[in-house]
Amino acid sequence: MYTALLQSMNRLHPRAWDFIQLVRLDRPIGIYLLLWPTLWAVWIAADGSPSLKHVLIFTCGVILMRSAGCVINDFADRNFDGHVARTRQRPLATGRIRTREAWALFAVLVALSFGLVLLTDPFTVALSFGALAVASLYPFMKRYTHLPQLVLGAAYSWGIPMAFTAATGRLPLEAWLIFAANLAWTVAYDTYYAMTDREDDLKIGVKSTAILFGAADRAIILALQGLTLGLLLVVGMRLGLGPYFHLGLLVAALCFAWEFVTTRRREPQACFRAFLHNHWAGLAILVGLILDYGI
């Protein structure tokens, strides 16, 4: 139904679907994976009572910046995507969208995002430039390092300190603990994602943690997910969070265990399902937080 609704946008413009695919609105998993930890920070920074203004700013900002990130990613990969089965039909790879059109869309998305951050405070505005820099850098890192997922982790975690500065004007230790937890989690789930393309990436020279970790990939992913839960547990202890938060962490742990078991044969589709499944872990933690503060 959601996809059909997006495809109906072609009635407004014959190329609408191409641009929807470019910004991945047809695949909202990236929005979820970026949104849940950002909202963890929004709730914790506001001691469980965030303003509607901040919830809307960060939710809309996530959607816009994730879309901008997809555009710059596809621009960077336009000469590689045609050689990978999963990506060869992307609009820039096929030429359905021209590079100058992609750059124009990227500029519009970034401008809209900046308009949102201007509704906060100078400290948060200053941090937003770092967010743009890291998000723009990530797509090019896979050419030079086996750790592009680490840069993606920083990009996907940048909204966390911004949420704290917007709500409190400062960056307490909890902000950095959540940042580190989310960075570890992002590296973990994006390694599952990279495992789906590992054979193609080896052929074309694209680097990733999936290639770097080799046969230890699943064990390292599980360790990173354990680190995520451990750091969040420390946050919970420091803030005196209660049983609902810990229940959310338990549900997340069960999600991680399921992913570990189902990827034992490293089949690409199983790895991709494990990647998708991670958003349920993030949502469980958010629901636990909201319930813990609200009850």
Curated annotation (Swiss-Prot):
Cofactors that this protein relies on: Mg(2+)
One Gene Ontology term, aspect cellular component: plasma membrane
Main localization category: membrane
Keyword Transmembrane helix among record annotations: yes
CDD domains cross-referenced by the UniProt entry: PT_UbiA_COQ2 (cd13959)
Localization: Cell inner membrane
Sample GO molecular function, one term: 4-hydroxybenzoate polyprenyltransferase activity
EC number(s) reported in the record: 2.5.1.39
Pfam families: UbiA
Cystine bridges: none
Reaction(s) catalysed (UniProt annotation): all-trans-octaprenyl diphosphate + 4-hydroxybenzoate = 4-hydroxy-3-(all-trans-octaprenyl)benzoate + diphosphate
GO BP: any one term: ubiquinone biosynthetic process
Keywords carried by this UniProt record: Cell inner membrane, Cell membrane, Magnesium, Membrane, Transferase, Transmembrane, Transmembrane helix, Ubiquinone biosynthesis
Homology family: Belongs to the UbiA prenyltransferase family.
Function: Catalyzes the prenylation of para-hydroxybenzoate (PHB) with an all-trans polyprenyl group. Mediates the second step in the final reaction sequence of ubiquinone-8 (UQ-8) biosynthesis, which is the condensation of the polyisoprenoid side chain with PHB, generating the first membrane-bound Q intermediate 3-octaprenyl-4-hydroxybenzoate.
This protein's name: 4-hydroxybenzoate octaprenyltransferase
Lineage: Bacteria, Pseudomonadati, Pseudomonadota, Gammaproteobacteria, Pseudomonadales
Gene: ubiA
